[in-house]
Amino acid sequence: MQPSRTRVSFFETGETMKQRKKSYLSIFVIFFSLFFFGIFMYNDNLKSSIADFTSSNPFSSSFVELPPDECDLFTGQWVFDNKTYPLYKEEECEFLTEQVTCLRNGRKDSLFQNWRWQPRDCSLPKFNARVLLEKLRNKRLMFVGDSLNRNQWESMVCLVQSVIPPGRKSLNQTGSLTVFKIQDYNATVEFYWAPFLVESNSDDPEKHSIIDRIIMPESIEKHGVNWIGVDFLVFNSYIWWMNTVSIKVLRGSFDDGDTEYDEIKRPIAYERVLRTLGDWVDHNIDPLSTTVFFMSMSPLHIKSSDWANPEGIRCALETTPILNMSFNVAYGQFSAVGTDYRLFPVAENVTQSLKVPIHFLNITALSEYRKDAHTSVYTIKQGKLLTREQQNDPANFADCIHWCLPGLPDTWNEFLYTHIISRR
């Protein structure tokens, strides 16, 4: 007796095979759906990571195109540009002092903020705060000099502070030194008050309104000890030399209580001071670790007749730069526009004759065109905002020395920025 066999017809086998194929197909579809979903999610995360990197990487947004070394950055013209200038807004920089906040102090026109310096044969790189801060990481940038260098220091603080999160930046003053600290970069942007660079009776950062200003042209160590170890030093000294035709030079020492002095012609005293600075640089600066700059003179705009506006009152009624570039403000018709050009070659020659290089930034001529950019009557005097009556008396109260911010000093810092980011 043979065991019974289960018979499977060909019809039944075909159906089973179809069911198996459907099962395999379903598994295949599910597998590849999960696979492609994973790829999609990975790409999404990758895109997010790339986006995060791009936003935090200062070099990713655009390639910084530097001007060629042979290009003269200081010969060019002012171009109206209300799309990319100003580089920051007055109300967005909490660190600006009342001395320079012209719009807040009542100035109605703001066109002075919209002028861009265009070199004749090249272009300045667009200012990028993150690129600069990377160069300043673990470093110190210090401005040393008078209130015009403080003007430029305030500008630099505003240029970089916008990319720093709240609570990650601070400002502290101790004596002559004011320090803006950027925590995430362990970097500082500092200002050191030394209006004559050498020792003087005007060295108090708060109380220096002295009629008889006296200097010690060969004494710089008291200040210089505070400059040791700084990575980028930016010197200036000019406006305090312009109060008198001659300069009082102390016989002896302030520490010894000496009060007698000699009066020396301004260019001679200026050269003595800059040679003292040069000697200090040569003996104390390692050019491999410290870069030194010297800013040329920041001009005054006191006489409106100098720029062919006999009806003007100092700089008070000026709303546009000198736009006729055929006038040579430095050596031609406008040679008297706020600059003692006897001092210019002194500064240029001394800074270029040292063993340690000093980069001479020639801001003078291009700044002479900017009769419109001063604080004028929209500023303070003796620590207090000008009253309405004082504002209505520009002949006596217009400040045609300092500059509104945002404004011209931002351009000076664009030159400085170009040099710093070009440093290998």
Curated annotation (Swiss-Prot):
Localization, UniProt: Membrane
Motif annotated as GDS motif, chain positions: 145-147
A GO molecular-function annotation: O-acetyltransferase activity
The keyword Cytoplasm is assigned to this record: no
UniProt membrane topology term: Single-pass type II membrane protein
Keyword Transmembrane helix appears in the UniProt entry: yes
Motif DCXHWCLPGXXDXWN motif: positions: 399-413
UniProt KW keywords: Membrane, Signal-anchor, Transmembrane, Transmembrane helix
Transmembrane feature ranges: 23-43
GO terms under cellular component: membrane
Pfam families on file: PC-Esterase, PMR5N
Job description of the protein: May act as a bridging protein that binds pectin and other cell wall polysaccharides. Probably involved in maintaining esterification of pectins. May be involved in the specific O-acetylation of cell wall polymers.
Other known facts: Contains 2 motifs that are conserved in esterases, but it is unlikely that this protein belongs to the catalytically active pectin esterases.
Membership in a protein family: Belongs to the PC-esterase family. TBL subfamily.
This protein's name: Protein trichome birefringence-like 28
Organism, as annotated: Arabidopsis thaliana (Mouse-ear cress)
Lineage: Eukaryota, Viridiplantae, Streptophyta, Embryophyta, Tracheophyta
